[in-house]
């Protein structure tokens, strides 16, 4: 735990707050399961670029993926198709490790109110360590000279603790990175249904408001 910050952050749509309190944090894949979305509609949402912010049949909202055009992904993916990358990131719950990245995402959400969950990392690891992974890049952005990426981008937490980014650099053919290179994202595969037991603080952000240091 000494190699991770004491807390991480999750930015959620304020409209989804009742669902989060009931069911915890769910990946897009899990949200589609919960809402009963199937067939071609599900395929479009889960395995292609979402150009619009969506409201599912149960009222839960799913954000667009405008920074992830398929053509840009095709140029930077290793051993994967764009549809597979969309499926991979839609199967995970994402956390930011610093407020600057969170605030950049918040700006991309425009005027929609947001809720920030501040998460205790020690509690998160205790509950979800076996399903946690770390990424050194913003996996949801492929604009402006996108970084090479693939399945190895998400390094399992236990592996990262022991050997840093070595599996990513080997798997993607990258230059070896220092073990101290900070992660950009922390992910939990599938869902984090009891995330409220890991929450230390909650911030409600009105339209245009950013998260500030305490």
Name every feature range the model reports, one short phrase each:
Residues 1-6, 18, 36-93, 97-214:
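Conserved NAD+-utilizing ADP-ribose enzyme module
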Residues 1-31:
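A structural/positional concept
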């Amino acid at each position: 735990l000494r190699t991770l910050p004491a807390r991480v952050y999750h930015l959620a749509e304020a409209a989804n707050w009742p669902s989060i309190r009931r069911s915890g944090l769910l990946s897009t894949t899990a949200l589609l399961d919960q809402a009963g979305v199937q067939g071609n509609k599900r395929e479009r949402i889960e395995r292609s670029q979402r150009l619009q912010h969506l409201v599912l049949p149960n009222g839960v909202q799913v954000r667009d993926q405008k920074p992830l055009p398929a053509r840009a992904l095709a140029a930077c993916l290793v051993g994967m198709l764009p549809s597979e990358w969309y499926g991979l990131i839609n199967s995970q719950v994402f956390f930011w490790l610093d407020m600057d990245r969170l605030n950049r995402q918040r700006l991309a959400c425009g005027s929609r109110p947001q809720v920030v969950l501040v998460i205790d990392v020690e509690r998160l690891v205790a509950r979800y360590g076996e399903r946690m992974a770390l990424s050194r890049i913003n996996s949801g952005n492929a604009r402006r000279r996108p970084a090479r990426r693939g399945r190895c981008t998400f390094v399992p937490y236990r592996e990262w603790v022991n050997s840093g980014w070595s599996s990513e650099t080997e798997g993607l053919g990258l230059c070896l990175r220092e073990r101290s290179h900070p992660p950009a994202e922390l992910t939990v595969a599938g869902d984090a249904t009891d995330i409220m037991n890991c929450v230390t603080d909650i911030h409600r952000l009105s339209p245009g408001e950013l998260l500030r240091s305490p």
